[in-house]
From Swiss-Prot:
Coiled coil: none annotated. Its EC number is 6.3.2.2. Keywords: ATP-binding, Glutathione biosynthesis, Ligase, Nucleotide-binding. The keyword Nucleotide-binding applies. Pathway: Sulfur metabolism; glutathione biosynthesis; glutathione from L-cysteine and L-glutamate: step 1/2. Belongs to the glutamate--cysteine ligase type 1 family. Type 1 subfamily. It catalyses: L-cysteine + L-glutamate + ATP = gamma-L-glutamyl-L-cysteine + ADP + phosphate + H(+). PANTHER family: GLUTAMATE--CYSTEINE LIGASE. The gene is gshA. The lineage of its organism: Bacteria, Pseudomonadati, Pseudomonadota, Betaproteobacteria, Burkholderiales. It comes from Bordetella bronchiseptica (strain ATCC BAA-588 / NCTC 13252 / RB50) (Alcaligenes bronchisepticus). This is Glutamate--cysteine ligase. It is an enzyme of class 6 (ligase). GO terms for molecular function: ATP binding; glutamate-cysteine ligase activity; metal ion binding.
Amino acid sequence: MTDTAAQRHHRLQAHADLLTQTLRGIEKEGLRVDHQGVLARTAHPAGLGAALTNAHVTTDYSEALLELITGTHTDVDSLLGELRDTHRYVYGVLEGEYIWNQSMPATLPPEADIPIAWYGTSNTGMLKHVYRRGLAERYGKTMQCIAGVHYNFSLPDALWDVLVPDAPTPQARRSRGYISLIRNFTRYSWLLMYLFGSAPALAREFMRGRDHLLETLDPSTLYLPYATSLRMSDLGYQNKAQSRLKLCYNDLDTFLGRLYEAVTEPWPAYQAIGTRRDGQWIQLNTNVLQIENEYYSSIRPKRATGRCERPITALAERGVQYVEVRCLDIDPLTPEGISAETARFVDAFLLFCATSDSPFFPDNGYCQRSADNFAVVVKEGRKPGLMLDREGQAVSVPQWGHELLDQIAPYAALYDQALGGDAYAAALAAQRAKLDQPDLTPSARVLAALREGNVSFHDYSLDLSRRHADALRAQPLPAERTQAYAEAARQSVAEQLRLEQSDAVDFDTYVAHYHAALKNPLPSTAS
């Protein structure tokens, strides 16, 4: 008998208390800039500890690209409270610098002078550094300075037992459920870009003289008039190796099999570069992907890994643990880069994706229609009369958006039922207004501020970042919280030193071991 979305919602309603065990966490990126809004060329601040081993503050691509990481939380208020505290601690350490509160970068130095993140001399640290050298060779450093907010989300196993009762084991129920969620996310994530995309403009110099289709807003600012998120668009940058990847979200095994092919298949252009230059490692290998994380996507199935364990192997052996939503822009109007309203809507949206009917994708498991809808919304989502493709039928953004909000509303209500209050319903109601009035979207508000203030993207962003810094510094952390962050920083330095002193093999051998740790997730297909 077919299990319908209505039946799953009914079962979910009877077990709504399990929603109190939803876990969510945030990784928020932000460039360090100097007082003029220029990318900081300083080393990672000592007061923030070792980027390799500090669980609260690390770096992403560049030495200047901070990444602030929360733990997992069972409610949004405590989640954002921790993120706010981490920002406050960081601002207590930074001297003469700000966190750039925009997804599109600040003023960047010449490409060659953008500093790649450094993690010390341990094999673990060097692996991370060389991987980033490879990204520079493949995509350029400028693109790697784009920042975002990653939202990690998991439902308790007991809830997957309710939603996916026909799978044979808890691991199978969980993995099947998350992959089903990802298919629906792929179908409907255009809505997140319309509602929360905050990157319609950028600094002209970001394009580095490349050809583009952007328009001029002022001498130093480029934009698209109806764009929601240039960060999630191609921006005129095409990567042939990744553009041919069509990963399948119909089942975990096929997804992992195709990802395995990408991290083991040589790519001629990368073979021409090689892995060393002047005796120095410049990329980990010459394959389509150096490692799994190089694959760019708006959502990922995730599983915590052990040291030297490969993500493919962890997912194949222990299944999906949570999903990582990667398409959220930094909210420039919020000091922490994401609001409670946004987080609550994303919760309800993801629960809707997990529970709704999620048919398999045709065409070998890749949905070109969904990719096209996403691409058009990030470039012209607010364009009057814009039509999207829903199963072969043209539908307007407001019509489809309102219909989706109608479908998401019962899941927002379930979170309110479980947690008390009406905060989830209020978050959903705020999104309806954006569909009716595109001028209320973050992307429209950013462009309005630039036009009305007759100000460049750079000056507007620097002013906002300064004001957020002032607001955060005006609320210093309690002494015991400051002490806890400082102690974590000290311990991270000691842990990095321990790793450097405990390496038993040279780096070449370590890289070989790391590649050898990758297991074919579909051994029956191995030749």
